[in-house]
């Protein structure tokens, strides 16, 4: 006679597929179920072991695939211990055995239903666990994005302002270079004008010397003319005395040369020559004087215009120097403002980059946590699927063995009645 025992065992599963064995006849029949605590990481798997002992061949199988079976002289093992060749299918307390078998079958079906309920409970707990352990609600980074956009706009505006300042500095530098070029040109022109003025001064000095020389020559000519007049008068007086002393001689002698006429002619000739020389000297003197006066007037006008130009150039130079100093001071102020702005916005940009780095680190951590939870969820779903397959396999096996058992039980009385009829 076969004996049956049923005991409950519990094993803990952390993850991954695990093997289960099913044996009928001197073996064990294990139907697992899964349950998990709320919020926990581990999953407990409880299995019900159905142990039978008896004679006959065993039905062996493994979880996850095929299972082999062999029968010898009836169904022996899982549900019976005397179901072989011999004196019939059942002997002794047949009703007790069948009742025990039916009770065991009902208990197993209850266990199957309990496993299904545990499976549904497990699915509920998995969903709850996923909701608890899953990623929380997405954080609202829109204020940070708005602040970043505002800072970017400020940086862009500051960059544009800096570009404008740099452009103004470049324009001021170009204007200063232009003014410097103009100043150098005007300075060269001033030096040229001063050189011309110095040359005109030398010419004026030369003309003054020439005028002085001419005046000296005129004075010398006047003195020479006075000396000639004096000599002429002396000669005339001497000749007059000679003529008076020779009157008597001339009376007696033959008529000679008319000396008075000769002297008058000589006087006229000398006076004409002197007048001509005087007029020529006066004309030359007047022409030279007028020429010198004209040159002096022209040079004076040029000197006055050059002085006015030099004054204007000095005034322009002073204005340019003042403007250059103001531009240099403005450039220094703008450069200091640019440095302060770059430092301030650089610090703000560094803070924003640090904030972005921390947010990216948090996002990476959240992604890693989500991937880990997703892998755990997939593992649990795989365990659930395998358990469902195992339950379905057990159910099919139970239904097949039950049909074979009842077929054997229904066919055995016919076999036992035939020898009786033969007798």
Curated annotation (Swiss-Prot):
Region annotation Head: where it falls in the sequence: 1-93
What does the miscellaneous comment read? Answer: There are two types of cytoskeletal and microfibrillar keratin: I (acidic; 40-55 kDa) and II (neutral to basic; 56-70 kDa).
**Domain notes from UniProt:** This keratin differs from all other IF proteins in lacking the C-terminal tail domain.
> Which protein family is it in?
Belongs to the intermediate filament family.
Region feature (Necessary for interaction with PNN)? 258-415
Q: Name one GO cellular component term.
A: intermediate filament
Region: Disordered; residue ranges are 403-423
Here the segments flagged for biased composition (Basic and acidic residues) are: 413-423
Q: Which GO terms describe its molecular function?
A: structural molecule activity
- Protein name per the record: Keratin, type I cytoskeletal 19
Give the region (Coil 1A) as residue ranges.
94-129
In this chain, the stretch annotated as Linker 12 covers 240-262
According to its UniProt entry, the function of this protein is described as: Involved in the organization of myofibers. Together with KRT8, helps to link the contractile apparatus to dystrophin at the costameres of striated muscle.
- Spell out the residue ranges making up region: Linker 1: 130-147
Establish whether keyword DNA damage is in the entry.
Answer: no
């Amino acid at each position: 006679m076969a004996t049956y025992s049923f005991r409950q065992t519990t094993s803990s599963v952390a993850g991954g597929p695990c093997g289960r064995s099913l044996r009928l006849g001197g073996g064990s029949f294990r139907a697992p179920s899964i349950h998990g605590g709320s919020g926990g990481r581990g999953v407990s798997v409880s299995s019900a072991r159905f142990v039978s002992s008896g004679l006959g061949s065993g039905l062996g199988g493994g979880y996850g695939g095929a299972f082999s079976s062999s029968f010898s002289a009836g169904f022996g093992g899982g549900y019976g211990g005397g179901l072989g060749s011999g004196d019939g299918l059942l002997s002794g307390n047949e009703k007790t055995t069948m009742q025990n078998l039916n009770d065991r079958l009902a208990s197993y079906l209850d266990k199957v239903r309990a496993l299904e309920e545990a499976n549904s409970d497990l699915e509920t707990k998995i969903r709850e666990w996923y909701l608890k352990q899953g990623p929380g609600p997405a954080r609202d980074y829109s204020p940070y994005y708005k602040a970043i956009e505002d800072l970017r706009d400020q940086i862009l505006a500051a960059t544009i302002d800096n570009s404008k300042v740099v452009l103004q500095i470049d324009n001021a530098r170009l204007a200063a270079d232009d003014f410097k070029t103009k100043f150098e040109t005007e300075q060269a022109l001033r030096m040229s004008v001063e050189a011309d003025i110095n040359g005109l001064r030398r010419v004026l000095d030369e003309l003054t010397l020439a005028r002085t020389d001419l005046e000296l020559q005129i004075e010398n000519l006047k003195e020479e003319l006075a000396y000639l007049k004096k000599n002429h008068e002396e000669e005339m007086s001497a000749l007059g005395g000679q003529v008076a002393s020779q009157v008597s001689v001339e009376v007696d002698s033959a008529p000679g040369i008319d000396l008075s006429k000769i002297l008058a002619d000589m006087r006229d000739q000398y006076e004409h020559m002197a007048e001509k020389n005087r007029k020529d000297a006066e004309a030359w003197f007047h022409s030279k004087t007028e020429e010198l006066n004209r040159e002096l007037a022209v040079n004076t006008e040029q000197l006055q215009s050059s002085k006015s130009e030099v004054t204007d150039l000095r005034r322009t130079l002073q204005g340019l120097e003042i403007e250059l100093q103001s531009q240099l001071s403005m450039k220094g102020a703008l450069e200091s403002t640019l440095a302060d702005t770059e430092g301030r916005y650089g610090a703000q940009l560094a803070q924003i980059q640090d904030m972005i780095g921390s947010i990216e680190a948090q996002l990476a951590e959240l992604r890693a946590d989500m991937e880990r939870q997703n892998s755990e969820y997939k593992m649990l779903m795989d365990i659930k699927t395998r358990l469902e397959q195992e339950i379905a396999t057990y159910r099919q096996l139970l239904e097949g063995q039950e049909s074979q058992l009842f077929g054997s039980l229904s066919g055995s009385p016919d076999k036992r009645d035939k020898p009786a009829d033969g007798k």
